[in-house]
Amino acid sequence: MSAGKIIQIIGAVIDVEFPQNAVPKVYDALKVESGLTLEVQQQLGGGVVRCIALGSSDGLKRGLKVENTGNPISVPVGTKTLGRIMNVLGEPIDEKGEIGAEETWAIHRAAPSYEEQSNSTELLETGIKVIDLICPFAKGGKVGLFGGAGVGKTVNMMELIRNIAIEHSGYSVFAGVGERTREGNDFYHEMTESNVLDKVSLVYGQMNEPPGNRLRVALTGLTMAEKFRDEGRDVLFFVDNIYRYTLAGTEVSALLGRMPSAVGYQPTLAEEMGVLQERITSTKTGSITSVQAVYVPADDLTDPSPATTFAHLDSTVVLSRNIASLGIYPAVDPLDSTSRQLDPLVVGQEHYDVARGVQGILQRYKELKDIIAILGMDELSEDDKLVVARARKIERFLSQPFFVAEVFTGSPGKYVSLKDTIRGFKGILDGEYDHIPEQAFYMVGSIEEVLEKAKKM
């Protein structure tokens, strides 16, 4: 293959000069003699290409020799990747030796065509009451977990992986994009303890890594998930955190010399997001269900990054700081969270009616809160008092102890089937549990546990 030399280094962006008749293509992988991999982003003319470094550019200098591999970055795929931790290039970082996969795939691939795509409306039960009731997930759908800093995106995601791996025994791919290394480490040990590590492939490009790694690691994970899908499996693809993917794009974009757009984001924000999201789809052979944590800067949902992400999702799970401050976990906001699946034709009339009934009562309670704050409970009509009492029970019943949080809470985790969830909330709406104190509904699984807890009070 052709060889060139480094002529300029600006942080993670490196210019390499090649002979005029052997200029690398955009997205080709280049190898520096020091062992670093570069990816071509732009052809500047005169044989010069501008690349991003997929690794630290420490120690690089002008004049170093660069080889063109002639192909995009390729990563190992298939069952050999299960139970392993890899970096953006698909190299193992868990000190367990080579991956040894029979096949490697390029990380840049075309999205499936219209003919290949399938549209299923099958539900994926998560065992988390508030999600199954208010914003049910579709098999092969896309889910966003929205929340500011520290409201529980990662914990919710870990619980989903644990529940789905154990209850549905499916394969998962987890892409850690620009998140804390400590969380990645905790996550690995959590998976080992739950005995589900052999069903998960882990790909990490964490906070301390250069922007090139964080920008490409989501594509590395997605490529591994696509391989499982094309083998006819139903695979889960988890991304934590999609905002850091956007942020890495912003860093790279500025270094590449592009003009910034709104709030300083890259002008190619919508396109970069689309390239990733359009590949996360289900075909007639298998499905990819994706769960993406979305950090919301300063709790502002109108920020260009979360706003662009919203457009691609089937379900949005919004985590609220106000609910977290009440001590109700998972801190999912039942009035803000949505799902395309919440339709009588998909979930059935009973589920739809119960979910809308729960939202109706909580909305009414929200309106009455101002009156209660000024005039007190005594000024409310009897009907409104009943609404408030039921709403407070519903609020507490939406909380649930998690398996992955047992270490912190000391209470064992609970998995609640969709049938039990609907039955429980229907009972509260119908007034069957009006005589039970609201404390009994807090941090329990099914409605039977509420009755048990009430007996001890």
Swiss-Prot record:
InterPro entries membership: AAA+_ATPase (IPR003593), ATP-synt_VA_C (IPR055190), ATP_synth_F1_bsu (IPR005722), ATPase_a/bsu_AS (IPR020003), ATPase_alpha/beta_chains (IPR050053), ATPase_F1/V1/A1_a/bsu_N (IPR004100), ATPase_F1/V1/A1_a/bsu_N_sf (IPR036121), ATPase_F1/V1/A1_a/bsu_nucl-bd (IPR000194)
EC number of the protein: 7.1.2.2
GO cellular component labels: plasma membrane; proton-transporting ATP synthase complex
Catalytic activity: ATP + H2O + 4 H(+)(in) = ADP + phosphate + 5 H(+)(out)
EC category: translocase
Any single Pfam family the record assigns to this protein: ATP-synt_ab
Subcellular location: Cell inner membrane
Binding site for ATP: G147, G148, A149, G150, V151, G152, K153, T154
Keyword Plastid: no
Alphabetized NCBIfam families for the sequence: atpD
HAMAP family: ATP_synth_beta_bact
The family this protein is said to belong to: Belongs to the ATPase alpha/beta chains family.
Subunit structure: F-type ATPases have 2 components, CF(1) - the catalytic core - and CF(0) - the membrane proton channel. CF(1) has five subunits: alpha(3), beta(3), gamma(1), delta(1), epsilon(1). CF(0) has three main subunits: a(1), b(2) and c(9-12). The alpha and beta chains form an alternating ring which encloses part of the gamma chain. CF(1) is attached to CF(0) by a central stalk formed by the gamma and epsilon chains, while a peripheral stalk is formed by the delta and b chains.
The name this protein goes by in its record: ATP synthase subunit beta
